Structure formats: structure tokens, C-alpha cells
Amino acid sequence: MDQTSIQASGGESATASTLKYMPGFGNDFETESLPGALPQGQNSPQKCNYGLYAEQLSGSPFTAPRGTNERSWLYRIRPSVRHTRRFSNASYPLWKTAPCLDEHSLPLGQLRWDPIPAPEERLTFLEGVRTITTAGDAATQVGMSAHAYVFNQDMVDDYFFNADGELLIVPQLGALRVFTEMGIMDVEPLEICLIPRGMMFKILKTGEQAVWRGYICENYGAKFTLPDRGPIGANCLANPRDFKTPVAAFEDKETPCRVHVKWCGKFYVTEIGHSPLDVVAWHGNYAPFKYDLRTFSPVGAIRFDHPDPSIFSVLTAPTEDAGTANVDFVIFPPRWLVAEHTFRPPWYHRNIMSEFMGLIHGQYDAKEEGFVPGGMSLHNMMLPHGPDALAFEKAANAELKPVKLDHTMAFMFETRYPQQLTKYAAELETLQDDYLECWDGLERKFDGTPGIK
């Protein structure tokens, strides 16, 4: 007999109005969806309440330093060994993994795309992932990939976990219901969510539009954490209390289901007779979370000059080299521009880091035209980039009174590794062939005579 029961903390049926979250970043949480399901005083009782099984999910080696040691104890209806059977090969040909050196004819250059097309076929979130760039090597847990996603169907009886890295999901069009082993998150545009490496989940659509679209950073390296604030001090940027981790929720469903796995760049599928989202209680610090980008508290120049964009870092995945990120997640949120005698947009730049950008909402101040919500750009290491001719002339001649840059939200996945373009991205019909022309209007002003020109 098919029976589906979705219960959240407190035994309530999980609806949007009853979803609850626990605040904090990296906390050691505890939560149960049935009273008494969580053991007290120990992790692995001889027998667990409700007939549950105890299982540990480790996100770091056992001997990692305490500050970076991550694990959670899960109390579930069946142990995970019952959530996989014999695997078969599966294929998601547009989801690529580093190292990926696709053959295509597009030469090196600065690149920009309009939004990827809406699908004509029925696609789930898993089927709708399209890789734009890859960097590093997933097998050695180094680097990242930048993906776009577009879908129109729910993952009803399909579940997925990614052994290659954690997934930072950035919705641009359409809200998501993200049902993970450890709870449920509703995530809308201008919010993000993170699903840890190895964690089972499925994604459902919420709302009535025709298509759901967004971006994903697949981080192969050390997990995302909050960047150090340095002399900024103890406050501002992304504050820990604004990160929300879901309370326990489980799906009690006895029906044929499929579990999909990504492992070292290959995909596999196995069939089971029940939902694997069966964690009734858990405690620990290896957990998913969501974050509202509108709660980011930006800092900036309050007298002159334009600071480095690192001041807008929300999350960073570090490497062994201090201050050098495997990947940074950076946003460009609404903010006041008040600098005197200053060119206020981002300056022209060549960078050892490689920058993938997307636009969630509004306009980006360095390029008011051509870079549209749902679009993407790629400026690889040491390739020059900066404001287009229109933005330069406007900012260079503007009256420098305080101006609020509002109704905008751009972001960047920035990595120390070169981002290799996939064949899909190189041949995408929305690639802007005329992107480089946006700088054509930047004429020579120098004539050898002193003075402002």
C-alpha cells in the first residue's frame, strides 16, 4: 500500500506556512520531528526509539581539527545501505565535471550570454542542469563548476546526491522547495541554499510560472565558510544569525523510487521501494542551509575610491594558501554610492582569478545594457574587463551626489583556477556575438597636454 507522510519538527505536516528553521552558521544543531526520537547523552544507543537506526554522516575526516570537523548523527527509518541497490549507468550529458576540455571552435575571449532557453520538453531539476564552465579536478577535490539550470517538473520519486562536491544553488526565476535528508527549505529568488556533499535531496517547484531557472556553483574543494572580516570587525557582510538550517522532516513513502548519484564525474541510478528522505531526528554541524541575500550588510568607501570587490564576499571556499580561494561567492547588492572625486563603478581590471557572473535581478552598474537577469558572463584570468563605454561616460561625467544603487542583485563565482568552457556553452544560441563591441566607444582622450579631458 502506498502511503506518503511528510512530517516536520513537532509532528506537523510540512507546508510552506509551517516550515521552521534554526538560525546560525556552523552551529551544532539538534532537531527531531517526533518527540523523543533524538537520543540524549549518547550518539548510538543499543536500540533507538521508534525503531530508528543511528547513522553518522561525515563531511570531514575524523581527525580534522575541531574548528573544521563536520559530522551529523541521523536517526532514520532505514539505514542508508537500504537506500541503494545495484547501480546502473545513467547519463546527464550536459552536466560536466572538471577536468573537462570539451572540443569546440570558440576561441579565448570575454564572453556573455542571454538567459538559456526555456525547455520544450519536460525536465526535472536534475535533468535541467547545464554546465557552463569547469575548473580544477573533482577527483582531487580541487576547483569548481558553474552551471545554469532550467526545469519545469518536480522530482517526485527521484532523489539525488552528489559525491563530487557541495551545491550552492542561486534561484533566478521561480521559487524552489528543497527537500533534503535533514529537512525542507523553501528558497526563492534573492535567496540561496547550500546542499552539502553526499546529502540526499529532491527539488520541487513552487509557484505557477512556466519555467524555473537559476545558477549552481558545484564546489569540489573545501566547504564554503564565512570569510574573515579582518579590520572590518565583528559585524557586517553576511552575519551568522541570518543563515537558516531546516528542522528535521521526513518522508514516509513506500513506493518505487530512484536514487541518482554523481561520483567522480559519472552518473549512476539505483531503484528502491521507498523514499530515502527518512531522517526523523538529527544532531550535528554538517547540514544544509539557506540565506537571504537581502540581509547582507555591505561596507564600502565613504570618502573616495572604489574598494576591491572582495568586500562583497558572502561565502568563501579556502585553499591551503591563505587568502586564495578555491571559489568565492560574491554579490553586488543594493547600496549607497557616496565617494567623492571618484569613478564609482567597478574599475577596469585584469585578474589572476577567473570570474563567472550572473544577474538575479535588476541592472549591474558596470553594464546597464546587455547583461540581463538570467544572463551570464565569463572573464577568465588575465582577460581585461570593466565598464562598457556607456557606463564609463555616464559615471565619468555624473554629478557626484549620494546615489542609492537600488533594485539590483548580481553575483560572481570567482576561482583561482581557469574556467574551461563547455561545448554546450560555446555553442549556446544565447551567446552574444557582439559582446566585445560594448567597449568600442572607449576612445583615446590623451593628447599630451595636461588637464582633465
Curated annotation (Swiss-Prot):
SUPFAM superfamilies listed in its UniProt record: RmlC-like cupins
Keyword Oxidoreductase carried by entry: yes
EC number, UniProt record: 1.13.11.5
Residues spanning the membrane: none
Swiss-Prot/TrEMBL cofactor(s): Fe cation
CDD domains according to UniProt: cupin_HGO_N
Binding locations of homogentisate: Y364, H385
GO annotation terms (biological process): L-phenylalanine catabolic process; tyrosine catabolic process
Annotated residues for binding of Fe cation: H349, E355, H385
Class of enzymatic activity (EC top level): oxidoreductase
Active site: H306
GO CC list: cytoplasm
Subunit structure: Hexamer; dimer of trimers.
Family recorded in the similarity comment: Belongs to the homogentisate dioxygenase family.
Its job: Involved in the catabolism of homogentisate (2,5-dihydroxyphenylacetate or 2,5-OH-PhAc), a central intermediate in the degradation of phenylalanine and tyrosine. Catalyzes the oxidative ring cleavage of the aromatic ring of homogentisate to yield maleylacetoacetate.
Record HAMAP family: Homogentis_dioxygen
Full protein name: Homogentisate 1,2-dioxygenase
Species assigned in the record: Rhizobium leguminosarum bv. trifolii (strain WSM2304)
